[in-house]
């Protein structure tokens, strides 16, 4: 399981870079709320994460159902973190770091035991 988590984390680094760049563009160029910026960054990055983890981490096929399960769960998590950040007036960098940490752990557990549970 540690080996899988290391692979998931490696892909997560690239995913995080994608998410952070989009988040920054939304906040500083488009002047959106943190909730919208976090969700938009998520939407762009989650597809990369899903397909890369399916192929390289879990060696599983990609299906519409798996994609919807993954995107749905991670999307809800993204909105919750963004909403909480707006309510607490957190600086954007704190929002990004918080979401990155939470989504790494929760995303791995959810992927391993729900989305890709049948993968060999």
From Swiss-Prot:
GO biological process: polysaccharide biosynthetic process
One GO location term (cellular component): host cell membrane
Lipid bilayer topology: Multi-pass membrane protein
This protein's UniProt keywords: Host membrane, Membrane, Transmembrane, Transmembrane helix, Transport
InterPro entries referenced in this protein's UniProt entry, alphabetically: Glc_translocase_bactprenl-link, GtrA_CellWall_Glycosyl, GtrA_DPMS_TM
Keyword Repeat: no
Transmembrane segments: 10-30, 34-54, 65-85, 90-110
Ranges in a coiled coil: none
Cellular localisation: Host membrane
The protein's role, per its UniProt record: Involved in O antigen modification. Involved in the translocation of bactoprenol-linked glucose across the cytoplasmic membrane.
PANTHER family: PROPHAGE BACTOPRENOL-LINKED GLUCOSE TRANSLOCASE HOMOLOG
Family per record: Belongs to the GtrA family.
Listed name of the protein: Bactoprenol-linked glucose translocase
Naturally occurring in which organism (per UniProt): Shigella phage SfV (Shigella flexneri bacteriophage V)
């Amino acid at each position: 399981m540690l080996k899988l988590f290391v692979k998931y984390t490696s892909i997560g680094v690239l995913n995080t870079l994608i998410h952070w760049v989009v988040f920054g563009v939304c906040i500083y160029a488009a002047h959106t709320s943190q909730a919208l910026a976090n969700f938009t960054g998520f939407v762009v990055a989650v597809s990369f994460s899903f397909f890369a983890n399916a192929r390289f981490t879990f060696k599983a096929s990609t299906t519409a159902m798996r994609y919807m399960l993954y995107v749905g769960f991670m999307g809800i998590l993204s909105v919750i973190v963004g909403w909480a950040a707006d309510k607490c007036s957190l600086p954007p960098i704190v929002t990004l770091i918080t979401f990155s940490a939470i989504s790494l752990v929760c995303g791995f557990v959810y992927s391993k035991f729900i989305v890709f549970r049948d993968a060999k």
